[in-house]
Every structure is written in C-alpha cells, then in structure tokens.
C-alpha cells in the first residue's frame, strides 16, 4: 500500500481525498455512528486515496479526529488529520503531535483554525499561541529531532525524529489586492517552513485557482520545490449555498452571480441536486485538466454522492474542462486578480501581471493606511533598533547596566508603556511584533494574534471576528508604498515567547531576548531569560523542582549556566 507522501511524489495520477467532518458527542451517538459508517464506505472505495478528518470545524467542539481516524487507518486507508492552533497552546500541540506520531498518523494538515464558536456555557476562549507557520516549523523540527533540555541540566538532548508529512491550506479567493498578495506570500512562507503539499480553500473561480497554480510554478523561492497543489471541491446544496451566502464560514464566499444560479436550480423538482453534483464534477475536471495533484472533496456525507460526482466526471470528454473553466468563474464585484487574463483560455496568463496591478507597482501612491504614526514609528525604530547605530549601542548599554535588565530604567519603562499604549494599544507582551507588521499590534488588533501573515478568514478586507480592517492588509499598504511588500514575511518565523509578558520589549529587543534573538550580538550581550513570573514561595504557586517538572534550570540559575544555554542554542536564542 502506498502512502499519501508516495502517491503525491509519483505525480503521474490525479488523487482524490474526501473530507470527513467530526461530530459532537461520543462514538455512541447516532450521528457519530453514521459518520463511522460513511468512513467505512470510504475505506472500501478504491477511487478514494485518503480520508481527511476535521479538527473542531467552524470552531465547534467535536470528537477528536484521531478517534474517527483510527479505524480508517487500521483498515489500510491513508488518513489526513487536521491539527489547528485555536484550542491548544504550543505545548498542547506538541503533545498532540507526539500522540499522533505514536499512533501512526503521519499526515497532518496544519491550520491556524477558525475562531471558537459557542461551546459549554458560552463561547470558548481562543488560544492561538502559535499559528500555522509556527506549527509547521515545530513539526518540521520534530522531523529532524526536536531539541529539548535534559531534566535539571543545562545541556540539550534530541528527541527521536518523527516522520510527519505536513501540509497547509492557502487561499487567494479574496476581493482586494491587500488581501490576495499577503495570502500568496504566506503560501510561500508555509512551504518554506515545511508544508509538503497545499490544499486550496473553497472557491468557485477557475481563473483564481489557476492563478495559485501559476504562482507556485513561477515564484523563484518555491518553484523548485514542486509542492503538490490540491484543488478544493465542495458539494453545494441550496441550503448550504444560502448558509455560505451569509458568510458564516470565514473565507468562503458565494458571489451574487453564483447565488442567483443556485437559487434558480434549487427551484427545480430535484432541488438542484443534479446541478450541484455536476458543478462539483466540473470543478474536479478543471483541476485534473490544469495539472493539479488531486482534488479534495467536501460537503459529502453519503457514498452515493461521492460515486455520483465521480461518475459524472468520468463521462466528460478529455478537453471539456477547458469550457468548464470559462464557465465556472464567479468572482465578486471588482475582485482583484494577480495575473492578466489569457483571452484564449479565459484563465491566468503567468507571463503578465494584471495591468492595473502592474501600473500600481510602477507608480506607488500612499493609501489611508500610510499614516504619520507609521512614518514616525518606523523612523524612530530604525534609528534605535538597527544593530550598529549609535542609539542602538547606547540603548544596549543602558539596559544591560540597569538594575533590572528585564524592565530597564523606570523612566524609560514608563515612557515605553505610555507611548506604545497610546499609539498602538499595546498589551505589554514583551515580545513585540510591531516592526514585523508595519507597526500594527497583533495582540490588540488581530483576533487571532497572527504574527506570520494573515489568516484566511477576512471578509472584504475586514477581520472575521471584529469589524475593522485586517492588520495585514494595512501592513501591506504601508510596505507597498515603500516598495517592500514582497519582503513582508522575509524573516524567521515569529514565535512569541510568553515568558516575556509584562517585561520591557525595548530591553528584550536590544538585549536579544525576544523573537529577533538571532542577531549576531545575541551570544555576547544576552542574559538567558528565565520565567520572570515564577514565584520563590513554597506551595502550589511556588517554585517547582526543576528535576520533577523538566524545567531547564531553576529560576535563580547561575549566570554562567545562562551563558552556557545561550551558546548551546537554548531557549533564549532560537535556531535559524
């Protein structure tokens, strides 16, 4: 039996995966039993290459995907487990990854995840400790043997390497330029951080789907990787189309033109069943014709629907997909395209940018997002935090020689807190990402604290949770005006260090304790951070035995041990 990794590496066939949505309740519940029965039928279907199992889809509490996945895996079918960041912090995600590896689940779809919906006694608190980029980075490092401190010692040991085959989701089904381009840049970042396959988001525009394929094939950073792209096909019904129309599912859009067609066919005697199945089959044919690695079929809950869609697709002539590609183009009004339209095919022309977009690159103009606040902040930051400048050296000296190197001089701490709270609504996280996001705070202005590019949930440029413009769209506008928008994610993955919360981000940046700690001075002028919030009192809230808990060192560790940790690549200096 071939693994999903081997099948995608073969590149000679067109694969098919089916999404299995988990349920709320135990395996004793009727709905779980129906889902289990459907899974059994998928296992027996030779045309299905893998089964993909969701992780609390839509932010709803549901049965663990591993509970549904075990019988499928043990029956011999490949399983793709969704793993999202909304419900676990990094420790929980690492623990879940170890469990998956131990149970034989090696295929993982790394997701930031949907914002939590209503749960037990109300809405659950979102976690989003790390994002999909951070998760991919962690899984990639686990594949190489994750470094970890020995119990009670300063030296590092290496865990046994895992064998994860990690993928990610990407979307360009967005209306505005400052949504689409950051999504494409994040797609590159996901591949750079370990995504070995990409699944597109639900969408109904063949030209947009072709654009993503062209982008992956032509971008110098990722073209050589030849990462497989899998097209997303969702079986609509009249009710689902109306549900999507309300934009209840973040990132999924039904345009006016498509909705009108759905409503028209919903009035037929079969309530549009034939039309919706044909639409799904046509999308599969388009993906096959364009050269996608496979199709990802969602919205199906019966094997009869799967078989019907596949039968319809087999009935098409070899080149019918070309006409379907012209037909299935349902953008929203004034939607942005990255590439120019090829008039012969109706699809993307990878040799030409969309004319209006290309013109905007030649003559860059400021938008409302290029504010005076931004310009002043950038000027001051460059003067103080650029290594080697006079103010940078002075700042390092001041904070290094202050009584409390985590807070710095009291006057500067007051100035930092007052200015950043006023200008950026700073939450005092101590590991500041303002310079990474064009001086916009992800803690106060992003519902998911996304520090490595936007999530996929924006609606017409606005946050899926709060009704304001996405910070990554605003950051793109600022960086585009300066000609640096293509570099907005050209940095190591940002993984926030929670132990720095409540400390001075100025001190942490200047002394190389924050996520930017890869700077050359880190080894010579950094004190390794310990948990500054740990208590020295005994009892439940007190300091814990480092041997019993697995902590790298006691809170009152000798400074020489701290410096050994720095040189060993310990917690205060992230690996490249």
Residue ranges and their predicted role:
Residues 16-20, 49-53, 79-83, 108-110, ...:
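Hydrophobic faces of well-ordered beta-strands that scaffold small-molecule active sites
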Residues 1-7, 37, 113, 126-164, ...:
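Active-site pocket-lining/capping segments in soluble small-molecule metabolic enzymes
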Residues 414-525:
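Metallocofactor- and cofactor-centric catalytic cores in central/energy metabolism, strongly enriched
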Residues 90-99, 182-185, 239-240, 305:
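Catalytic cores of alpha/beta
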Residues 1-49:
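Conserved N-terminal beta1-alpha1 strand-loop-helix module at the mouth
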């Amino acid at each position: 039996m071939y693994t999903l990794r081997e099948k995608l590496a073969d590149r000679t066939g067109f694969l098919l995966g089916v999404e299995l949505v988990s349920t709320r309740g135990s395996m004793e519940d009727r709905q779980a039993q129906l889902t289990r029965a459907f899974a059994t039928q998928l296992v027996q279907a030779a045309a299905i290459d893998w089964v993909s199992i969701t992780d609390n889809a839509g932010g709803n509490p549901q049965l663990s995907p591993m509970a549904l996945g075990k019988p499928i895996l043990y029956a011999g079918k490949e399983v793709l487990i969704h793993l999202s960041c909304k419900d676990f912090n990094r420790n929980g995600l690492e623990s879940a990854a170890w469990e998956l590896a131990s149970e034989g689940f090696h295929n993982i779809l790394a997701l930031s995840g949907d914002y939590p919906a209503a749960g037990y006694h109300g809405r659950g608190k979102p976690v989003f400790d790390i994002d999909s980029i951070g998760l991919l980075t962690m899984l990639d490092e686990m594949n190489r043997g994750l470094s970890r401190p020995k119990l009670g010692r300063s030296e590092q040991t290496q865990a046994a390497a895992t064998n994860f085959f990690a993928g990610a989701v990407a979307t360009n089904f967005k209306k505005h330029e400052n949504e689409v381009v950051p999504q494409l840049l994040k797609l590159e970042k996901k591949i750079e951080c370990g995504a070995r396959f990409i699944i597109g988001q639900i969408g109904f525009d063949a030209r947009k789907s072709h654009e993503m394929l062209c982008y992956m094939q032509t971008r110098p950073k990722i073209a050589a990787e030849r990462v497989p792209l899998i097209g997303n096909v969702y079986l609509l019904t009249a009710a689902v189309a109306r549900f999507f129309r309300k934009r209840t599912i973040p990132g999924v859009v039904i345009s006016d033109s498509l909705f009108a067609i759905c409503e028209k066919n919903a009035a037929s005697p079969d309530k549009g069943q034939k039309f919706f199945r044909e639409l799904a089959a046509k999308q599969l044919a388009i993906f096959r014709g364009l050269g996608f690695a496979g199709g990802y079929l969602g919205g199906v809950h019966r094997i009869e629907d799967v078989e019907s869609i596949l039968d319809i697709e087999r009935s098409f002539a070899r080149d019918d997909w070309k006409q379907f590609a012209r037909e299935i183009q349902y953008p929203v009004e004034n939607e942005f395209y990255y590439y120019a339209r090829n008039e012969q095919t109706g699809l993307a022309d990878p040799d030409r940018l969309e004319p209006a977009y290309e013109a905007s690159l030649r003559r860059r103009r400021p938008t409302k997002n290029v504010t005076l606040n931004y310009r002043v902040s950038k000027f001051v930051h460059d003067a103080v935090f650029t290594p080697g400048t006079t103010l940078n050296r002075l700042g390092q000296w001041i904070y290094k020689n202050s009584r409390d190197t985590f807070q710095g001089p009291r006057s500067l701490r007051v100035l930092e807190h007052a200015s950043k709270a006023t200008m950026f609504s700073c939450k005092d996280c101590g590991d500041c990402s303002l310079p990474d996001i064009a001086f916009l705070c992800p803690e106060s202005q992003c519902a998911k604290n996304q520090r490595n590019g936007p999530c996929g949930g924006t609606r017409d440029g606005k946050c899926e949770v709060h009704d304001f413009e996405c910070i990554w769209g605003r950051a793109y506008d600022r960086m585009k005006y300066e000609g640096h928008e293509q570099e907005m994610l050209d940095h190591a993955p940002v993984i926030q260090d929670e132990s720095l919360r409540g400390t001075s981000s100025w001190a942490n940046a200047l002394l190389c304790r924050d996520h930017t700690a890869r700077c050359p001075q880190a080894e010579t002028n950094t004190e390794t951070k310990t948990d500054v919030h740990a208590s020295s009192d005994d009892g439940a809230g007190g300091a814990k035995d480092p041997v019993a808990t697995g902590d790298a060192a006691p809170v009152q560790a000798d400074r020489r041990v701290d410096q050994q940790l720095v040189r060993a690549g310990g917690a205060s200096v992230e690996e490249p």
